[in-house]
Amino acid sequence: MICIECGYSNIDCLYSKYKSDYIKLSVCPECNKIADKYIEYDSVILFLDILLLKRQAYKHLAYNLTEMEMEIGSSTNFHINDNTNFKFFHTYRKLMKLIFMILSFEVYLTWANEEKLLIHSQLINLIFNQSVVYQYLFFIIKSSLENLILNLSLQLILRLGYKWGQGPQKINGNIRDKELFGYKTSVLLVTTMVSGSIRLFPILMFIWPYDNISITKPLINLIAFINIVEALRVVTSLGYVELILSLAFSIVIRNIVSKSLLVLIVRLFLDFNFTEVYYNEMYQLYSQIQTYIRWI
């Protein structure tokens, strides 16, 4: 566990429980403040503080909740070989449920927004000519690919490029070396997914509709970008320049790779001119970049 106030990374436990069910919160030996006040806070308060980008709330979520989830997952029986990647999904199954929920909302939102647009790319026109099942599968694959590529790129850049979590001091002194890789992966993953989930707020627009989606979507994406950068700064302690460049580069990689793979996957099932549709997707991406530049 870590202290969410000063970042001290060798807190043995966040609270002590006595026979009378009396709970005493641990005090950080470095700053002499309560190591993690959110242990006794309601989840709603934590959610609101995360929306407000409070530093302590994000450290509690990314570091301490992730460690508690890891301890619970590791304590349960797991019959598959320990070397398999399935152990990660078993250990962090609550994180996997959170990602699944975010993806489910994102699929619905992306699908609904595309239907509301008057002009679509050639690929989307091809998809909308298919049955609802094929459309649903397409948007599931689209959202999954985009999130996978974005998070993978960001993990590689921050951990290999900027050496986050590789210094002489561990980011969490309680984590064993063999569990450190999965823990660091989860810390960055939960930070990026939760801070980026602000993109889901336009779901409210289906209740209170806005007139111009083409303006609203770039604005929401820009807010999400700022939100992710600020959350990553709190969790990783890297500078704004490094994080802005890392996230921007990861988004470009995500868009290029995901669009290319989507065209390739759809081509396996539908007959169309691959080159024409691919260049149309790249042109759409170029237009989006120009839109964001105008917003900035």
Curated annotation (Swiss-Prot):
GO biological process, one term: sphingolipid metabolic process
Glycosylation sites: 64, 151, 273
Main location: endoplasmic reticulum
Loss of function: phenotype: Leads to avirulence using a BALB/c disseminated mouse model.
Entry-linked Pfam families: Arv1
Signal peptide span: none
Keywords: Endoplasmic reticulum, Glycoprotein, Golgi apparatus, Lipid metabolism, Lipid transport, Membrane, Sphingolipid metabolism, Transmembrane, Transmembrane helix, Transport, Virulence
Compartment annotation: Endoplasmic reticulum membrane; Golgi apparatus membrane
Gene Ontology CC terms, in alphabetical order: cortical endoplasmic reticulum; endoplasmic reticulum membrane; Golgi apparatus; Golgi membrane
Membrane topology: Multi-pass membrane protein
TM region positions: 99-119, 121-141, 187-207, 212-232, 233-253
UniProt record similarity statement: Belongs to the ARV1 family.
Protein task: Mediator of sterol homeostasis involved in sterol uptake, trafficking and distribution into membranes. Also regulates the sphingolipid metabolism. Required for growth during anaerobiosis and sterol uptake. Plays a role in pathogenesis.
Name this polypeptide is given: Protein ARV1
Organism: Candida albicans (strain SC5314 / ATCC MYA-2876)
